[in-house]
Amino acid sequence: QRWPSPKVPP
């Protein structure tokens, strides 16, 4: 499982 990067826009 992968979490989205904290830099991705909402």
Swiss-Prot record:
Biological role stated in the UniProt entry: This peptide evokes transient hypotension (-11 mmHg) similar to that evoked by 0.5 ug of bradykinin, when injected alone into rats. It has a high bradykinin-potentiating effect (101%), when 60 nmol of BPP-10f are coinjected with 0.5 ug of bradykinin into rats. It inhibits angiotensin converting enzyme (ACE) activity with a K(i)app of 2.32 uM.
Example of a GO MF term: peptidase inhibitor activity
Homology family: Belongs to the bradykinin-potentiating peptide family.
Cellular component annotations (GO), alphabetically ordered: extracellular region
Species of origin: Bothrops fonsecai
Signal sequence range: none
Subcellular location: Secreted
Protein name (record): Bradykinin-potentiating peptide 10f
Disulphide bond pairs: none
Recorded superkingdom: Eukaryota
Tissue: Expressed by the venom gland.
Main localization (coarse): secreted
A biological-process GO annotation: regulation of blood pressure
Keyword entries, A-Z: Hypotensive agent, Metalloenzyme inhibitor, Metalloprotease inhibitor, Protease inhibitor, Pyrrolidone carboxylic acid, Secreted, Toxin
